[in-house]
Structure formats: structure tokens, C-alpha cells
């Protein structure tokens, strides 16, 4: 969705129990099958209203949440991602807030004007495609090999992915129809592998599994060098079965577009209609549009010094806690 279609959003309140709640939220429109999509999410006006109230009451009384957005746009991320199950949505919110505290290098200062993030956006490291799929999915492209391992780390990659996620997660169609993630690994070298470790992959997977409020409809790796398959296998081995079942590897974009995606959606350089530069430009504009809102997220806070499942200790159990044992080569061809 081009940023010209959207109005700038005000910086939301972070008070856990504000005097007045922000109920403003756009309805998902533009899809022929939107009614069917909402039915799958178990979303009805009354259910939505009741769950928003329940989430807000829960946040206000939560012993560990100190500051958090309570506006409808934000809370609907979690409710829609978890098909309006209050229990699962609230657990996901706890882990989302905990991940923000534990991994500041991923989540803090999501500023497109930051020199490093700006450069990665300029070279096309990651960007969403302008057009959605027929089912309304937002599609993102990551050319992971463009990350210079002499200049950047895996943390920069994670930060760029979070930047994109936060820039689009209040979009009602993104919340309802979901996203498809495409990773072009054509330019990945041995040097790139040196900045990746199984422990980092496990932490990334833990956030995707438990704290990411997005409906992930597909994750695809294309042009994977043989030497980089351990990275793909490692990450996938840590993912929950539901997400793993939506993952696939393709030899090239010819094979990928024949089986999974309309090629016309891709940048012109991949055989589509619109030049890559136009997709990248729209992404930068979106990040500028939501810049203040994303920077305000840095003030959200949750206490992690306790024995709950989202404690600092529980969130940071490392590779020695069994990650190596669960790592195995998967047949992904």
C-alpha cells in the first residue's frame, strides 16, 4: 500500500490505564473475500469490542507491564494474529514486550534517518512490494546478501525486519490477510555465514514463534547457495510446526513464481512490472510517515525480573539449553 493512501497517525498514548482509550481503527477493505477472511479470524463487531475491553482491563491490572500502547490499532495486531483468542493474544503481547526489552538492538531507535538503517534501505536490503496478492497478503523481499558482513551484523538485519514490521503492522489488511516473506539468498557468501550463529537463530525463532503479532502466510528462500543451507535448516528447525509448514526453498525465481507467486507482483528486475526503486521509495516514505510513532515504542516497558514464562531468564535460555539437540537437517527441496 503506497504511503500516499494513508494519513499520518498521531503518536499513541503509552499509559497502561489512560482516562480515555483510542478506539479509532480503519476497517479492512478492498478485498473481495474480506468477509471470509474475518470469519476465519472469528472477528465480529461484538467479539472485537469485548476482546479490546478485556485486553485493556488486563493490561491495566498487569503486575509487570509498566507502559504499553492500548489503542485499538495496536491491540488488534495481537487479537487478529491469534484469531481473537484472548489468552493467546495476551501471552503474545507479554512476549512481544519482553523481546523489546531483551533485544534493544533489534527494537530500539527504529528510525529511517539513522545512517545505518537509511543505507540498508537505500541499497534495497529489504522492502515490501507495492501490490498485494489476490488474497490480500503483503509481500516483503529481502536480498540478504546485500548486508555487508564487514560493516553490519545479524542485529542490523533483525532491526531492518522489525522496522518494516512496525511500519506496516497497524495496517488492517496486513493484520487480517497476513504477510508473505521472500528471502533472495543469491548474494550470500561465506563471509555472511560468519556473522550467523545457532544461538542467534534460536532467539530470532523464539520471537517469531511466541512474540510476533503477524499472520505469516508463507516464508520462502530462493537462490540458496549450498553452503548457506545450514542457516536455513537451523532457523527452520527452531520454528513451530505451523510456521515450518509454510516454509519452502526454491532453486530460482522461475520455479518460485510458477508454484507460489504471480511474477507481476515482483520488481521489474525479477520479471515484474514496477522497478525495484519504486518499491524501495514507497517503503522509505512509509517509514517517514510512521517515524514518530515507531520511535515512541522505545518507551514501552515490562518488568522481567520474576519467574513467569516471559521473564528475562526464560526469554534468554541459550543454545546450551537444548538448541543443538533440536537442530537437524531438514528435507526442504
Model-derived segments and spans:
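Basic, amphipathic alpha-helical/coil surface patches used to engage anionic, phosphate-bearing ligands
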Residues: 1-333
Amino acid at each position: 500500500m503506497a504511503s500516499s493512501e494513508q494519513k499520518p497517525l498521531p503518536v499513541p498514548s503509552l499509559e497502561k490505564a489512560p482516562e480515555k482509550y483510542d478506539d479509532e481503527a480503519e476497517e479492512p477493505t478492498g478485498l473481495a473475500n474480506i468477509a471470509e477472511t474475518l470469519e476465519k479470524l472469528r472477528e465480529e463487531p461484538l467479539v472485537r469490542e469485548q476482546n479490546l475491553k478485556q485486553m485493556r482491563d488486563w493490561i491495566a491490572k498487569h503486575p509487570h507491564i509498566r507502559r504499553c500502547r492500548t489503542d485499538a490499532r495496536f491491540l488488534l495486531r495481537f487479537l487478529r494474529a491469534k484469531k481473537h483468542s484472548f489468552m493467546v493474544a495476551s501471552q503474545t503481547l507479554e512476549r512481544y514486550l519482553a523481546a523489546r526489552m531483551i533485544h534493544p538492538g533489534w527494537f530500539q531507535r527504529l528510525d529511517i534517518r539513522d545512517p545505518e538503517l537509511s543505507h540498508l534501505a537505500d541499497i534495497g536490503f529489504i522492502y515490501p512490494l507495492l501490490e498485494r496478492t489476490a488474497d490480500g497478503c503483503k509481500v516483503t523481499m529481502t536480498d540478504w546478501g546485500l548486508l555487508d558482513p564487514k560493516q553490519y551484523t545479524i542485529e542490523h538485519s533483525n532491526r531492518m525486519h522489525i522496522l518494516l514490521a512496525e511500519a506496516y503492522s497497524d495496517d488492517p489488511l496486513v493484520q487480517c490477510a497476513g504477510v508473505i516473506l521472500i528471502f533472495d539468498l543469491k548474494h550470500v557468501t561465506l563471509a555472511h555465514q560468519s556473522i550467523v550463529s545457532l544461538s542467534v537463530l534460536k532467539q530470532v525463532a523464539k520471537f517469531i514463534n511466541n512474540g510476533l503479532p503477524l499472520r505469516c502466510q508463507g516464508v520462502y528462500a530462493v537462490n540458496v547457495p549450498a553452503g548457506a543451507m545450514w542457516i536455513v535448516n537451523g532457523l527452520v528447525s527452531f520454528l513451530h510446526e505451523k510456521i515450518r509448514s509454510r516454509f519452502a526453498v526454491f532453486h530460482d525465481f522461475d520455479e518460485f513464481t510458477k508454484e507460489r507467486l504471480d511474477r507481476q507482483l515482483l520488481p521489474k528486475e525479477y520479471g515484474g512490472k514496477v522497478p525495484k526503486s519504486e518499491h524501495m521509495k514507497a517503503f522509505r516514505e512509509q517509514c517517514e510517515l510512521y517515524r514518530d510513532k515507531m520511535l515512541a515504542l522505545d518507551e514501552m516497558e515490562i518488568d522481567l525480573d520474576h519467574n513467569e514464562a516471559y521473564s528475562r531468564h526464560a526469554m534468554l535460555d541459550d543454545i546450551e539449553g537444548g538448541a543443538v539437540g533440536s537442530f537437524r537437517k531438514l528435507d526442504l527441496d
